[in-house]
């Protein structure tokens, strides 16, 4: 088995296109302690992908709700006109 070295260089546009096409996940965890006392903890998960890539992934693992796909989004009610509604 031999190692092949690519002599082609990639432009920034090609790298970004590849990342958006395949997606990338960066999972980071850092903890700063002094004398056993935790001062700072950082947890981060960054996902970079195109909307098309996420939709293909969500459909493959069943994250998309069937009722939204079949019936569309539900109608908005006007019970609280002028008041923004947020739900989590």
Swiss-Prot record:
It is found in: Gas vesicle shell. One of its GO terms (cellular component) is gas vesicle shell. It holds the Pfam family Gas_vesicle. The minimal pNL29 gvp locus overexpressed in E.coli can be filled with Xe and used as a contrast agent for ultrasound and magnetic resonance imaging. Disruption phenotype: Required to make gas vesicles in E.coli in the absence of GVP 1. One of its GO terms (molecular function) is structural molecule activity. Keywords: Gas vesicle. The gas vesicle shell is 2 nm thick and consists of a single layer of this protein. It forms helical ribs nearly perpendicular to the long axis of the vesicle. Belongs to the gas vesicle GvpA family. Gas vesicles are hollow, gas filled proteinaceous nanostructures found in some microorganisms. During planktonic growth they allow positioning of the organism at a favorable depth for light or nutrient acquisition. GvpA forms the protein shell. This is Gas vesicle protein A2.
């Amino acid at each position: 088995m031999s190692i092949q070295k690519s002599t082609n260089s990639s432009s920034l546009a090609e790298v970004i296109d590849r990342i958006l096409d395949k997606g990338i996940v960066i999972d980071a965890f850092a903890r700063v302690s002094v004398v056993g006392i935790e001062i700072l903890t950082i947890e981060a998960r960054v996902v970079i992908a195109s909307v098309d890539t996420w939709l293909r992934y969500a459909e493959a693992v069943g994250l998309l709700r069937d009722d939204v796909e079949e019936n569309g989004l539900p109608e908005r009610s006007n019970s609280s006109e002028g008041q923004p509604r947020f739900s989590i």
